[in-house]
């Protein structure tokens, strides 16, 4: 955690750009942690984006962010929006899309196999009905027909 003070004019605080204001400048303190920057003793008024300088072992980094302030009558600590790293979210999203695509392909293959089994069962049911009809026809003819067929075969 590091603490630093920034001196800026009220114009710069209000409009965010470099300017010459007739008002005296004021000093503002910022506390920077590993993930957030807090402004100490801030007044509650609209804020434009500002450049924040964060020091780390690799050097000094500048980031633009807009201040988010609580709307109450008491001045307090305000939080600044963090920049979001979408690379991890993109990787997870890509992995999810790949998994989802693979699952869809597997389900389509299983659905095709199931449809083939259903077609085979319907075909076998039709064959069974035909065989049952032939059996009933043969039963209805009686022994004379069966005997006649037997003799023809001999």
From Swiss-Prot:
GO cellular component: axon; cytoplasm; intermediate filament; nuclear matrix; plasma membrane
Organism superkingdom: Eukaryota
Region (Coil 1B): 154
Region entry Linker 1, spans: 132-153
UniProt crosslink position (Glycyl lysine isopeptide (Lys-Gly) (interchain with G-Cter in SUMO2)): 104, 120, 129, 139
Span list, region Head: 2-95
Keywords of the record: Acetylation, Cell membrane, Coiled coil, Cytoplasm, Cytoskeleton, Glycoprotein, Intermediate filament, Isopeptide bond, Membrane, Nucleus, Phosphoprotein, Ubl conjugation
Organism in which the protein naturally occurs: Ovis aries (Sheep)
Listed name of the protein: Vimentin
InterPro entries reported in the protein's UniProt record: IF_rod_dom, Intermed_filament_DNA-bd, Intermediate_filament
Residues recorded as bearing Phosphoserine in the entry: 5, 7-10, 25-26, 34, 39, 42, 49, 55-56, 66, 72, 83, 87, 144
Gene responsible for this protein: VIM
Region described as Disordered: spans on this chain: 1-31
Region span, Coil 1A: 96-131
Residues annotated with N-acetylserine modification: 2
Phosphothreonine PTM sites in chain numbering: 20
Taxonomic lineage of the native organism: Eukaryota, Metazoa, Chordata, Craniata, Vertebrata
Biological-process GO terms, alphabetical: cellular response to lipopolysaccharide; cellular response to muramyl dipeptide; intermediate filament organization; positive regulation of epithelial cell migration
Assembly with partners or alone: Homomer assembled from elementary dimers. Identified in complexes that contain VIM, EZR, AHNAK, BFSP1, BFSP2, ANK2, PLEC, PRX and spectrin. Interacts with BCAS3. Interacts with LGSN. Interacts with SYNM. Interacts (via rod region) with PLEC (via CH 1 domain). Interacts with STK33. Interacts with LARP6. Interacts with RAB8B. Interacts with TOR1A; the interaction associates TOR1A with the cytoskeleton. Interacts with TOR1AIP1. Interacts with TOR1AIP1. Interacts with DIAPH1. Interacts with EPPK1; interaction is dependent of higher-order structure of intermediate filament.
Cellular localization per UniProt: Cytoplasm; Cytoplasm, Cytoskeleton; Nucleus matrix; Cell membrane
Entry text on domains: The central alpha-helical coiled-coil IF rod domain mediates elementary homodimerization.
